[in-house]
């Protein structure tokens, strides 16, 4: 099974509106809003303005859960040695999971506003980013990206 099975079940069942408090967009880059952190995971509401994207990147050891709360987003999957596998279109309500055994990914927003929920475990991982076949160093999380920290634990009520 997946390394985040319990959290995956919770996120799949989540249909609340409390994330809308963090629905704020930026013209420069996607906006990462930290809404929960504990010893097991950190949770972000990420707001994507038109045509914003991540670099190709990896994840912390237990992986990442992504749920689309509004809009839709393209997810490109790559092998660990950065060979393209496929592109998936994630629409509102869709949940996907990735870890480093599955490979790397790049998230690309189209010409629309999108809001997504991301769970990473363990927390505070500084992802590795890749360009082509080349590893470009640590510090993906918040390095040149709009990184916003909120003290709210809005998801604790959902058992995370």
Predicted regions, residues:
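Short acidic-glycine-tyrosine-enriched beta hairpin
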Residues: 65, 77-109
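Asparagine/serine/threonine-enriched low-complexity, disordered tracts
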Residues: 15-17, 128-153, 158
């Amino acid at each position: 099974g997946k390394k985040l099975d319990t959290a995956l079940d919770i996120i799949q069942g989540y249909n609340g509106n409390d994330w809308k408090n963090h629905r704020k967009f930026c013209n420069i880059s996607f906006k990462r809003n930290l809404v929960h952190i504990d010893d097991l995971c950190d949770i972000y509401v990420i707001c994507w303005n038109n045509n914003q994207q991540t670099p190709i990147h990896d994840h912390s050891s237990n992986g990442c859960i992504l749920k689309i709360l509004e809009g839709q987003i393209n997810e490109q999957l790559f092998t660990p040695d950065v060979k393209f596998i496929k592109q998936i279109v994630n629409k509102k309500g869709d949940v996907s999971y990735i870890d480093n055994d599955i490979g790397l990914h790049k998230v690309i927003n189209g010409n629309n506003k999108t809001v997504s929920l991301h769970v990473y475990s363990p927390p505070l991982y500084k992802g590795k980013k890749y360009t082509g076949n080349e590893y470009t160093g640590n510090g993906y999380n918040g390095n040149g990206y709009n990184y916003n920290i909120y003290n709210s634990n809005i998801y604790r009520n959902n058992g995370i």
